[in-house]
Design a protein with these regions (language model features):
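Canonical Radical SAM [4Fe-4S] cluster-binding loop centered on the CxxxCxxC motif
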Residues: 19-61
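A short acidic, helix-capping loop that chelates divalent metal ions and anchors anionic groups
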Residues: 50-51, 151-157
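Auxiliary Fe-S-binding modules of radical SAM enzymes
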Residues: 1-18, 71
Length: 157
């Protein structure tokens, strides 16, 4: 399997079977992977193989990048079905996740009110109230908590 490291906070769009034309938001460093798990099936590879040297994008950097792309797509009549938090690791691990979600919902409504906002997450940070509050704002939570202990079932992570 090839490894993908997303070099920008905003990537795509990609054509998704589930989500349609989907613009991605990567809240992790652009040069590596930061995730609470190390799943064998992850397209970003293993954490140890891609240790980042750069910092995570700031809330302002994400907002500016997202607005630029959304405005351009809107002005050029390019369709968009979904904005998806995904990328180089676990998006809910970003310290400003809730604020970034709030900004994303605002910009989505402004430029593509018919589009959805989705989060691909391994659900490890849902114990944090702020993460739960942020997840309640989005349209589509795609949460997948894989087992991490062999005696509890199939454990890909």
């Amino acid at each position: 399997m090839s490894t993908i490291i997303y070099p920008s906070p905003i990537f795509g769009p990609v054509n998704s079977r589930r989500l349609g034309v989907s613009l991605g938001i990567n809240l992790m460093p652009s040069d590596g992977k930061v995730c609470s798990f190390d799943c064998v099936y992850c397209e970003c590879g293993f954490n140890a193989d891609f240790r980042p040297k750069k910092k995570r994008p700031t809330r302002e950097e994400v907002r500016e990048g997202l607005e630029k792309v959304l405005k351009e797509r809107h002005d050029n009549n390019q369709p968009l079905d979904d904005i998806t938090f995904a990328g180089n690791g676990e998006p809910t691990g970003h310290p400003d996740f809730k604020g970034i979600v709030e900004d994303t919902m605002e910009l989505c409504k402004k430029y593509f009110p018919e589009a959805q906002v989705s989060v691909l997450s391994n659900a490890t940070y849902i114990y944090k109230e702020e993460v739960r509050e942020a997840l309640m704002l989005v349209d589509n939570n795609i949460l997948k908590l894989s087992c991490t202990m062999q005696d509890h079932g199939r454990c890909p992570c």
